[in-house]
Amino acid sequence: MDKHTAAIPTLTIKVVLLGESAVGKSSIVLRFVSDDFKESKEPTIGAAFLTKRITRDGKVIKFEIWDTAGQERFAPLAPMYYRNAQAALVVFDVTNEGSFYKAQNWVEELHEKVGHDIVIALVGNKMDLLNNDDENENRAMKAPAVQNLCERENLLYFEASAKTGENIYQIFQTLGEKVPCPEQNTRQSSTHDRTITDNQRIDLESTTVESTRETGGCNC
């Protein structure tokens, strides 16, 4: 980072990704952080921590991104990752009805445990599976159900594709606009009050930190 960039005000935003396994959370992060996509990707075991900086309106926005495991056995440990988050992406697969209802549960839990100040974006991922489907026969959830949830819970809503990159950057850009900007934000990311560094994977069962070589994982 050069001296000019270092002088630009920086807003740090902690973002947590939640959703059922295999809805594409890690692929969304990988697309945003590295502009990459892997057709075959192993499920997240634990949680991955990644960062990405963008410049917007004369300030640097640093996203501290927690990509959490979607398996049910890890769900009780998720609060340690969404605690103190300013924003959340709650992801579902547009072709999987069950994943939408799981996303709805996550939204309700966030509002119950974190409060209503957190900015939540509901993301319908895998739109690439529908782009050639004129009749939307493969779409699991119709617009009214999604819109009702967004209006009731005051959510942002995006339909996206980690595979093609559709709307991925726009999701994070919008979070950067919606999260309030304090005069100074010096919060550090931590797990059990332990500071960690970029691009590391967390073992949710033992809460130990392990290095990883992986670099990535429209309003209603």
Swiss-Prot record:
GTP binds at residues 19-26, 67-71, 125-128. The keyword RNA-binding does not apply. CDD domains: Rab5_related. Keywords: Cell membrane, GTP-binding, Lipoprotein, Membrane, Methylation, Nucleotide-binding, Prenylation, Protein transport, Transport. InterPro entries: P-loop_NTPase (IPR027417), Small_GTP-bd (IPR005225), Small_GTPase (IPR001806). The keyword GTP-binding applies. GO terms for cellular component: cytosol; early endosome; endocytic vesicle; endomembrane system; late endosome; plasma membrane. The modification Cysteine methyl ester is found at C220. A lipid is attached at C218, C220 (S-geranylgeranyl cysteine). GO terms for biological process: endocytosis; Golgi to endosome transport; protein targeting to vacuole. It is a lipid-anchor. One of its GO terms (molecular function) is GTP binding. It is found in: Cell membrane. Belongs to the small GTPase superfamily. Rab family. Present with 830 molecules/cell in log phase SD medium. Required for transport in the endocytic pathway and for correct sorting of the vacuolar hydrolases suggesting a possible intersection of the endocytic with the vacuolar sorting pathway. May be involved in recruiting the MON1-CCZ1 complex to membranes enriched in phosphatidylinositol 3-phosphate (PtdIns[3]P) or other charged lipids, leading to recruitment of YPT7. This is GTP-binding protein YPT53.
